[in-house]
């Protein structure tokens, strides 16, 4: 990457401050762009879901990995919970989705609670493991909530044997009353579901898989307590990427934790952070990290900069840290501060190999929280920062009440936030489509067919606030 006309900014820059200049291109189509990353994480799109309690869970991990990304489970989860999540994700199919499952005797109330755990919008009613009907939310309207789902389920739905080509599934669903096909095993038992859009995505995305062809998943460990023991347990549970995570990565305690984990030779990429300087990047890499997380304070739920004055504008931080890592043949992840697909593209242009996304994905069906509605009946999910009082209380549950109360005084994050869902595009896959479409287009404008070429060829300019505002669409006129 280079700056336009050799310009050297006199101050640090955020994503809003910069733009990418179009270049002569021989990349004819967005589908000619390879979004696979090159940092050993195994991602085939440059998207990593941040280790936030309100974002990263097993449903999110399954869905994102199927599209080529990676989810990092939070450090606060008990080892047993992580083990369960890893086993679940690695047992999932690479093409078809896990269904929301009901029995004939479940109630309409059960159905309305569970349907929105997945973006495909239906629940499968199964008896003795065999699908007998589908329930949509519309089927439950105007019905007593104690009504049995067998009385509202439709039996008019498409079925196909597992292994059916996704293109054929797409064709079967073209005139179907419900846009979901139910896939069955040879014995007639339920295998999963696939929508028309899912069938299309199966031909666009390449799942992020391990050496045994199973979906990938990562997990985080903090710098307190038995770091080595937990890291060892996470590796034994089968995680594919391990993250040593703390808000201030450039401290002695973090360096000691990295050295401790690196000495275990666990055989998985070791990510560590967070830092915002070349010096901090070098120290973490020299301690044993293979990838460094960059970002202090850019996240939507983070109040660190306003509380402490500490941090750095994210684009400049990524640019400097990526340059330092490259000299050691290592990599960085840009963590936080992305609000639009352009921000992801700019982080990649600056040299990040992956971009971590948190709050943006909190408002999706696949995030762990329950779907709620505001007084205007708009759907939303709650989110909070991982250094907030709410997160601190959850993290210190084993401490004495006095210690918990004392630690709760020192929070740096939003404890309650509402992340709205778009009812028509509420799935994380919709956001992944949105992001990767933007990044692919960026590559065609730059003349890059890979992410490495994007960084190599990108020419970045600095703009005014008015320049950034000019780029916003005006759907309602002016």
UniProtKB/Swiss-Prot annotation:
Glycosyltransferase keyword on record: no
Catalytic activity, as annotated: IMP + NH4(+) + NADP(+) = GMP + NADPH + 2 H(+)
Residue numbers annotated as active site: 302
Cross-referenced SUPFAM superfamilies: CBS-domain pair (SSF54631), Inosine monophosphate dehydrogenase (IMPDH) (SSF51412)
Gene Ontology cellular-component annotations: cytosol
CDD domains: CBS_pair_SF, IMPDH
Cofactor(s) needed for function: a monovalent cation
HAMAP family: GMPR_GuaB1
Family listed: Belongs to the IMPDH/GMPR family. GuaB1 subfamily.
The name this protein goes by in its record: GMP reductase
């Amino acid at each position: 990457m280079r700056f336009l006309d050799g310009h050297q900014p006199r101050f640090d820059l955020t994503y809003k401050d910069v733009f990418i200049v179009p270049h002569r291109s021989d990349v004819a189509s967005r589908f000619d762009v390879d979004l696979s990353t090159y940092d050993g994480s195994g991602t085939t799109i440059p998207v990593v879901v941040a280790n936030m309690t309100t974002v990263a869970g097993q449903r999110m991990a399954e869905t994102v990995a199927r599209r080529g990304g990676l989810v990092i489970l939070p450090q606060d989860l008990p080892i047993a919970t992580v083990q369960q999540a890893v086993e679940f994700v690695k047992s999932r199919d690479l093409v078809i989705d896990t269904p929301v499952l009901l029995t004939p005797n479940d109630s309409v109330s059960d159905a309305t609670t569970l349907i929105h755990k997945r973006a495909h919008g239906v629940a499968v009613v199964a008896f003795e493991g065999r699908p007998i009907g589908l329930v949509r939310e519309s089927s439950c309207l105007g019905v007593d909530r104690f009504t049995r789902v067998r009385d509202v389920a439709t039996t008019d739905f498409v079925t196909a044997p597992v292994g059916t080509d996704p293109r054929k599934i797409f064709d079967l669903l073209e005139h179907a009353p419900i846009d979901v096909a139910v896939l069955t095993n040879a014995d007639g038992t339920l295998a999963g579901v696939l929508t028309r859009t899912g069938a299309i995505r199966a031909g666009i995305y390449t799942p992020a898989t391990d050496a045994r062809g199973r979906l990938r998943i990562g997990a985080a460990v903090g710098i307190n307590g038995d770091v080595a023991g937990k890291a060892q347990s996470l590796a034994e549970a089968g995680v594919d990427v391990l993250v040593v995570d703390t808000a201030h990565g450039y401290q002695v305690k973090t360096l000691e934790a990295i050295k401790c984990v690196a000495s275990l030779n666990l055989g998985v990429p070791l990510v560590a952070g967070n830092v915002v300087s070349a010096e901090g990047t070098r120290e973490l890499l020299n301690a044993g990290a293979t990838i460094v997380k960059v970002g202090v304070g850019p996240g939507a739920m983070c109040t660190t900069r306003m509380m402490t004055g500490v941090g750095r504008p994210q684009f400049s931080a990524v640019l400097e840290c990526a340059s330092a890592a490259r000299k050691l043949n290592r990599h960085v992840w840009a963590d936080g501060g992305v609000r639009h697909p352009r921000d992801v593209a700019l982080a990649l242009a600056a040299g990040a190999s992956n971009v971590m996304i948190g709050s943006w994905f909190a408002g999706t069906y696949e995030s762990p929280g329950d779907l709620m509605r505001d007084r205007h009946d708009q759907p939303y999910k709650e989110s909070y920062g991982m250094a907030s009082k709410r997160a601190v209380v959850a993290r210190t549950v084993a401490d004495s009440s006095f210690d918990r109360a004392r630690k709760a005084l020192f929070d740096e994050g939003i404890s309650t936030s509402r992340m709205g869902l778009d009812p028509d595009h509420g799935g994380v896959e919709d956001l992944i489509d949105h992001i990767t479409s933007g990044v692919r287009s960026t590559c065609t404008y730059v003349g890059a067919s890979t992410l490495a070429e994007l960084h190599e060829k990108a020419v970045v300019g600095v703009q005014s606030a008015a320049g950034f505002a000019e780029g916003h669409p005006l759907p309602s006129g002016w």
